Structure formats: structure tokens, C-alpha cells
Amino acid sequence: MEIGLLILLFSVSAYAMLAKKLSTTIITAPMVFLGIGFAVSQLGFISIGDAHETVYLIAEISLVVLLFLDASQINLRRLKRQNTWPLRMLLIGLPLSILIGTGFAYLFFPQWPWAMLALVAAILAPTDAALGQAVVSNESVPLNERQSLSVESGLNDGLALPVILFFASIVAMETGSQENEMSWLVFGFSQIFIGILVGALMGYSSGRLFLYSESKKISSTIYEGIGVLALTGTSYLMATLMGGNGFISAFVAGLAFGNSVKGHCRFIYQFTESEGQMLIWSSFVIIGLGLLPSAIEHLTFPVAGYILVSIFIVRPLAIYLSLIGTKAKTLTKVFMGFFGPRGLATALFALIISKDILGQYGHSVLIIAINAVWMSTLIHGIAAAPMANWYGAKIKVLKIKSRELARLKNRK
């Protein structure tokens, strides 16, 4: 096991030294660390048995922290005032992705109950900007598009989670995996409601306390990071103890806290750009190490077919429809629809749901989710840099042409 850990740590150091150069190529961080985890597992340096409990532990920690930090960086007032694209992608595109995905899932898995089909579609709906970093950080892509994709990926995992829990509850009822069906449904709703309530109260009150201590100069920026991470864990544990869902609580707490402090807490952004990256890399290593071997072993044609349809048809169609009526060009709608890579949220949601809720269908959900992550990592990772450059150049030409046409019309 020590040799495996040595390889992992050496790989992290090597990637960190080459990160700037690699960011301009088709090689992405998720691709590298997913591959390293898989290779170490296959070579026998770290066995899956050794990593089994670690997978769940890191999954829970990663999901709690990332949900909180993603939500805390979203300015709700600015989101309302500025570009409507991300709002439409979230409020129209996300439900459409789940609806269309459910329909296509039936074609591949007709024997499954409808709630199971909807659950799989909901788990594949969230996107991960980390897999398309070459797009959101490429300045040749217009700012509107980059911001829209970043905001959408920051919020859609938290918005999809209540839907995932709802369908998971129905699956438990339909498959008889719970003795008291009504109590299980009530439990599902209480998880969502209490999670939202606790998260909102914890996030808002902590934000106000943070601003008060800052105004009275009784705190220090040195310790604000410790306080924020403690709040993240507190919101999760408090909701869990009160019978709510800790992940929903962490997301709502981040949203409430970030909009209360309104940019005063620099740690939120600094952690995401530094230590947060390490957390993301570790999660991909763990997925490659403990989950990917089994997922590939159980990959079937229906599973692969549904994943490809989800990547190339379901999300692009949903986003295209959600942007109808805006000033977005057809090329922009297609581009933003394609760049919805499935990443950590998909893997971690499936892992936690399969462990705690689903029973007999848990394995199937996990197989689809993990295979979706590695396939999306390759497809979107390879396409990100070249397509971002191509789109940036193409949209620039289209804008020049549209301005010229406008001038000609004005002259007439």
C-alpha cells in the first residue's frame, strides 16, 4: 500500500509542476487522477478492500465541502439582475434534462420502475465545471458563456439533490425495500424540509455573526477559513441530528452564508482555488481506485448507450430548449448544451444513495454513474480546449457579421 501512496503523491507533485502547460492541452486534472487511481488499483499496489471505507468517507467530506463552497460563491441578487441564461438553464434546463433523460432511460431499461428511470436521469443531470476547466477559463470564449456555465454547475448539484432524494424514496416504496412505505415517503420529505430549514438558519446567522465580528475587529482573517469549514461540518451534522439531510443543509447554508457576507469572506474563493483543488483531485483518485474497476467490469451496451445519449442528446436538447427566446445564437445553445460534463456530484450522489437508500437497485445506479463520469471525463476533457478555441473564433466571426448586417440595414 505504501508504494501505491508514493505513486499517488509523486503524481500530484508532477501534475502541479506541469499544470499550466497541461491546461492548454487535452489532458485535464480529472482525467489524470481518475486514471492514476485506476492504474494503481489494477497494478495491485492498493486493493479495493483497503479503499472501501475510505471511498465513503472522502465522498461524504468532499460532497459536503464542495456543495457549501459552490453555493457560497453564487450572488443571488446579481444572478437576478444580470444575464438570464444560467437561470433559464437551471429552472427550465435542469427539469427538462431529468424529464427527457427519464424518457430515454425507458428505451434502454424498460424493465425498471419509472421512479428508478427518473432517479438515474436526475443523478446524471448535475454538471461539473472542473471537467471543462479549459472552457470556463478560456478567454477566447465570451464572458457571458463562461459565467453561465460556471453559475449553472455551481447550483445545479444542490438543486438536483432534493429531486434525487424524492425519487430514491419512491424507488424504496415501489421495490418494497422498506417495510412501511408511507413512513419512508414522510422521511424523504422531512429530510428535504429540515435540511433546507437548518441550512438557511445556520448559514444566515453565521454570516451575520461573521460580519459583526469583522466590524468590531474581534476576529482575524487568519482564522476565517477554520470558521467556514467548521460551519460546513456543523450545518451537515446539525441537520442530520434533527432528522434532515446534511447535504441539502450544507448547500443551503453555503447559499445563505455567501449572500450574507457578500464577498467579505475571501477564504471561500481562496480555498476553492487551492485546497479545494486537492480535495477534487483526491476524490477522482478515490473514484478511480475504489469504484472504476467494478464499474468497467459491469459496463454493458445499454448502460454505455444511455450514457452517450445523455451526453450528446439529453442535456444539449434540454439546454437548447431552455435558451429559446433569448439572444443566444444557435451555435451558443449547442455549445453550452454539450459542455455539461458529469463529474463529482454524479459519482458522489450515486455512491451515497446506493449505500444508504436504494437496496437492490443501488448497484445499477452506481455502475451507470461511475461509467458516466469516466466517459464524460474523456469526452469533455479531450474536447474542452480545442472546442473552446474553435467556438471563440467562430462566435467572434458571427458577431462581426451580425454587426455589419446591422450597419447595412441602418444605411438603408
Feature-to-residue mapping (PLM):
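Transmembrane helical cores of multi-pass secondary ion antiporters/exchangers
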Residues: 1-412
